[in-house]
Amino acid sequence: MRRSPGSYVRIGRVDEVYLFDASSIVNLVRKGIVKPLADGVTLDLALYESLSAVWKEFKLLKRFDEAIALELLDIICDVFNAMKIISAKGLEKEVFDLASEEGLTIYDAAYACAAMRNELTLVTDDQELRKTASKHLTVISSSELASKYRD
């Protein structure tokens, strides 16, 4: 899935270099590290994936009570209000092709394609996505990124 340099479309400010998936967003919020999120971008689908992750931990895994779940939801919504949100609309064929070629879910392929298209570094804590996407683009974990913001 090679692209010619002219096929990339740059979004936002020049200093926006990170595209966050839902796993990295939720993990950074849990750690109380939100500055990198405000400086980055994500896909519109990440909000609902993030909310789903909180719901799963609250309702199914019972890792915390409803008050904590609602607090996390409020913080996540605030974070999304501060982030630049982009859409994967228009990438459907690329997303499907990448998912089919690499065995990714459509959601994971959407993050990878959006990062490739816009020359962004993908931030994910999903090990399978990281392993596969790193063949095509730069990928880091939220912990790696957080350490850059602490220094």
Locate each region found by the language model.
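Short, polar loop motifs at secondary-structure junctions
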Residues: S23-G32, D125-L129
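PIN/NYN-family metal-dependent endoribonuclease catalytic core
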Residues: V29-R63, A67-I68, K84-S87
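Active-site neighborhoods of divalent-metal-dependent phosphate/nucleic-acid chemistry enzymes
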Residues: S4-S7, M83-T121, D125-E128
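Acidic, PIN/NYN-like endoribonuclease modules and their adjacent C-terminal/linker elements
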Residues: M1-V17, L43, E49, R117, ...
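Amphipathic alpha-helical segments within well-ordered protein domains
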Residues: L51-W55, C77, F96
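Internal, well-ordered alpha-helical scaffold/interface segments
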Residues: S23, Y48-S52, D74
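An acidic intrinsically disordered interaction segment
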Residues: V9-I25, D78-M83
